[in-house]
């Protein structure tokens, strides 16, 4: 049973070809936008790679970049086909490329949908990766002389300044680790000895944060040492508005930042998907309506076009059979070629 059959006069075929041409180049432009957004997200994830536990989230920009590239290529070739569809002689040159084109176009739509699903599904994975990565970055903050960890301090300092955040979940995360290297501690000092002895595992812990947690907009000089001790500072209340360090955790800040970029990527991919689907449908109508024209001198004849010649399942099964037959014929040709080569030697 033919699905979505439509009649096309010569004028309607011309308008269809013009519409296809416009949609094709819009698809190219949106593909460029999608590709650029994917590259931007990839770079941003790479910049903060040191405060992430794994690179699973990179699957999102990789898929978006792929969707953008495929969209550009398919849009370009669809535009070329639309221009050739008005000349039966030129159109015949593209006829053999139609089925591979449709296969790639459907695959491209699937990639777009996969990018959308990954943008939503990997949010939890990204949050967990940031949670573990930031926790390790804070723990290794002091290890500036240790190979593999020497850039953790710089990465964490830059992150807190750029995103106006402090710690993993909140500033108190710094209270739970020794973030000052033993290299810069005076072990002859009674205060240092007392702090180390008071810690269960012999660490130098204090209720203080790095300078990068300070809010430069505060009129008061930054209070970054003995933050929870109200009596250590004049006219100060830790529970009130006197705190002049960032109270937002870096995980929340980064997650919000990446979620915003992914939402923009999702919008670009959605638009790309809609355009590619429109190009696919339009090109299918162009193909089926042009295939009805047998005589090159009868280009202006009325024809019929359709999306599917059979039902959906029948079309899928028929396509799978054609693909299987194609692979079988290739295997036979390869085997015959190998046999001839062996006989010749």
Swiss-Prot record:
Record's keyword annotation contains Acetylation: no
Membrane-crossing residue ranges in chain numbering: 25-43, 62-80, 100-123, 265-290
Topology in membrane: Multi-pass membrane protein
Chain ranges on the Cytoplasmic side, renumbered to this chain: 1-24, 81-99, 291-345
Lumenal compartment segments: 44-61, 124-264
Stored Gene3D superfamilies: Tetraspanin
Metal-binding is among the record's keywords: no
InterPro entries found in the cross-reference section: Peripherin/rom-1, Peripherin/rom-1_CS, Peripherin_LEL, Tetraspanin/Peripherin, Tetraspanin_EC2_sf
Location within or outside the cell: Membrane
Tissue specificity note: Rod specific.
Primary location recorded for the protein, binned into one broad class: membrane
SUPFAM superfamilies in UniProt: Tetraspanin
Record keywords, A-Z: Disulfide bond, Glycoprotein, Membrane, Transmembrane, Transmembrane helix
Glycan-carrying positions: 54, 229
Short name of one Pfam family: Tetraspanin
GO cellular component entries: plasma membrane
Gene Ontology biological-process entries: visual perception
Subunit structure as annotated in this protein's UniProt entry: Homodimer; disulfide-linked.
Family from the record: Belongs to the PRPH2/ROM1 family.
Protein name (Swiss-Prot/TrEMBL): RDS/peripherin-like protein xRDS36
Organism per entry: Xenopus laevis
């Amino acid at each position: 049973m033919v699905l979505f059959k439509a009649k096309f006069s010569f004028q309607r075929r011309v308008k269809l070809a013009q519409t296809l041409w416009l949609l094709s180049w819009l698809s190219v432009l949106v593909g460029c936008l999608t590709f650029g957004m994917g590259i931007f997200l990839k770079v941003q994830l790479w910049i903060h790679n040191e405060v992430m536990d794994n690179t699973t989230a990179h699957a999102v920009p990789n898929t978006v970049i792929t969707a953008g590239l495929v969209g550009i290529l398919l849009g370009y070739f669809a535009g070329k086909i639309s221009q050739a569809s008005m000349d039966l002689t030129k159109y015949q040159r593209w006829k053999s490329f139609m089925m591979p084109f449709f296969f790639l176009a459907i695959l491209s739509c699937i990639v777009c949908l996969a990018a959308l699903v990954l943008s939503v599904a990997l949010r939890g994975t990204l949050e967990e990766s940031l949670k573990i990565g930031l926790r390790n970055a804070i723990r290794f903050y002091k290890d500036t002389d240790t190979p593999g960890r020497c850039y953790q301090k710089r990465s964490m300092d830059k992150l807190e300044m750029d995103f106006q955040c402090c710690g993993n979940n909140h500033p108190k995360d710094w209270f739970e680790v020794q973030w000052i290297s033993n290299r810069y501690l005076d072990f002859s000092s009674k205060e240092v000895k007392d702090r180390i002895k008071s810690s269960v595992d012999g660490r130098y812990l204090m209720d203080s944060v790095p300078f990068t947690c300070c809010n430069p907009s505060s009129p008061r000089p930054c209070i970054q040492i003995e933050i929870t001790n109200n009596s250590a500072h004049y006219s100060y209340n830790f529970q009130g508005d006197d705190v002049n360090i960032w109270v937002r955790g870096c995980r929340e800040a980064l997650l919000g930042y990446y979620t915003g970029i992914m939402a923009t990527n999702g919008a670009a991919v959605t638009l790309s998907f809609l355009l590619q689907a429109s190009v696919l449908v339009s090109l299918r109508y162009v193909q089926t309506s042009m295939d009805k024209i047998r005589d090159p001198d009868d280009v202006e004849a009325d024809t019929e076009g359709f999306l599917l010649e059979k039902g959906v399942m029948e079309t899928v099964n028929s396509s799978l059979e054609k693909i299987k037959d194609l692979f079988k014929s290739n295997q036979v040709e390869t085997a015959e070629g190998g046999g001839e080569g062996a006989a010749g030697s």
